[in-house]
């Protein structure tokens, strides 16, 4: 009897110790947390995919198919390893400004000594290709030991505002300046003509068997979700919504400053970036031009144009949580 009592006590002690170790082990807790967070984000991803699939199916049934999201189409990264930051630049989404921000963070002293601007023309940008990469894998390699923890930042803007800026700059200003290029499919400033042709090109690009080369127009007009390898890394990004007009830029810029501050960017550098961004504008800014106002008014007054824009950009509104009131009007 005594023998069985001693054996039972030993077993209970062993079980108690094992249970205590299991629930207090940091590695075990870390594994559970990782699994829980991973599953949480997976559920969000699955729910979002279901919603996007449903919207696409409804549009298809109505004969107005939407351009699908998350095509791995265009990628431009500028990095600042000192602060473990990578900035993805999206064309016509303050890409010139963000290129300048990445550059001043890359080598602040040299940037300041040379009296450079974060808004300088793209072709004369100070850092050039010194801190620029085309693939996230290249960025991870360059980040070295920080490749698991570096911060991914991207600036986006309302898809319709972005389109108006693109069309005013590329399909009116540049098309008139360089007529021999027959830019924007030679539509001569006709918004409907351009959207019809661009929609068909995006349909081809989204095909698994597409062999057409991305054009200048494709890259500038592509849906937001086709950039930055969002299909793989969307949940990892710090997403900043930033308006182009300096009067409306303050809130988004404050968010950007907070994100940079989290990465220990000095206050003096933050003040320089904020002051430059609020007081200046890039060479390609169109928000206060006559062409911008004409295109904006045309979109507001023409339901057919809004329908084409919806077919191309509607899922951007959903994915990045922009107000859909206007696009649905």
UniProtKB/Swiss-Prot annotation:
Stretches of the chain found on the membrane's Cytoplasmic side: 1-3
Tissue expression remark: Highly expressed in the head and tail of hermaphrodites, in particular in amphid and phasmid sheath cells.
One GO MF term: chondroitin 4-sulfotransferase activity
Pfam hit, one: Sulfotransfer_2
Stored InterPro entries: Chst-1-like, Sulfotransferase
S-S bonds: none
Catalyzed chemical reaction(s): chondroitin beta-D-glucuronate + n 3'-phosphoadenylyl sulfate = chondroitin 4'-sulfate + n adenosine 3',5'-bisphosphate + n H(+)
Subcellular location field: Golgi apparatus membrane
EC number annotated for this UniProt entry: 2.8.2.5
GO biological process, one term: positive regulation of response to oxidative stress
Tree of life domain: Eukaryota
Transmembrane segments: 4-23
Keywords: Carbohydrate metabolism, Golgi apparatus, Membrane, Signal-anchor, Transferase, Transmembrane, Transmembrane helix
Ranges of the Lumenal topological domain: 24-329
Phenotypic consequence of gene deletion: The tm576 deletion mutant is lethal. The ok625 deletion mutant has reduced levels of 4-O-sulfated disaccharides, but increased levels of 6-O-sulfated disaccharides. Increased mortality in response to oxidative stress.
Gene Ontology cellular-component terms listed: Golgi membrane
Binding residues for 3'-phosphoadenylyl sulfate: 91-97, 157-165
Membrane topology: Single-pass type II membrane protein
PANTHER family per UniProt: CARBOHYDRATE SULFOTRANSFERASE CHST-1, PROTEIN CBG14245-RELATED
Function: Catalyzes the transfer of sulfate to position 4 of non-reducing N-acetylgalactosamine (GalNAc) residue of chondroitin.
Family recorded in the similarity comment: Belongs to the sulfotransferase 2 family.
Protein name per the record: Carbohydrate sulfotransferase chst-1
